[in-house]
UniProtKB/Swiss-Prot annotation:
It comes from the Bacteria. GO terms for cellular component: ribonucleoprotein complex; ribosome. It holds the Pfam family Ribosomal_S10. This is Small ribosomal subunit protein uS10. One of its GO terms (biological process) is translation. SUPFAM superfamilies: Ribosomal protein S10 (SSF54999). PROSITE patterns: RIBOSOMAL_S10. Keywords: Ribonucleoprotein, Ribosomal protein. It comes from Ectopseudomonas mendocina (strain ymp) (Pseudomonas mendocina).
Length: 103
């Protein structure tokens, strides 16, 4: 896999899960002899929802909810075949979305 790069994008609602997953990926890649750039934290997306808790009137009675989506990017430069095999066998947490692209 000469002159290739693997870009891994991670998304999760819990920042502890995403940090743990990135740490596992970095350790696995370094153990197999690849060079790792990152993890690079991307901006956190905050979605806010406002809900009326009153059944009829009284617009002052509201609840506000927020969902935060944390994102990280990792670049693995010049991966070996052992690196790709190790990353495929890696078991990450259930709440983390992983996108892998070759470039």
């Amino acid at each position: 896999m000469q002159n290739q790069q693997i870009r891994i994008r991670l998304k999760a609602f819990d920042h502890r899960l995403i940090d743990q997953s990135t740490q596992e990926i970095v350790e696995t890649a370094k153990r197999t002899g690849a060079q790792v750039r990152g993890p690079i934290p991307l901006p956190t997306r905050k979605e806010r929802y406002t809900v009326l808790i009153s059944p009829h009137v009284n617009k002052d009675a509201r609840d506000q909810y927020e969902i935060r989506t944390h994102k990280r990017v990792l670049d693995i430069v010049q991966p070996t075949d052992k690196t790709v095999d190790a990353l495929m066998k890696l078991d990450l947490a259930a709440g983390v979305e992983v996108q892998i692209s070759l470039g």
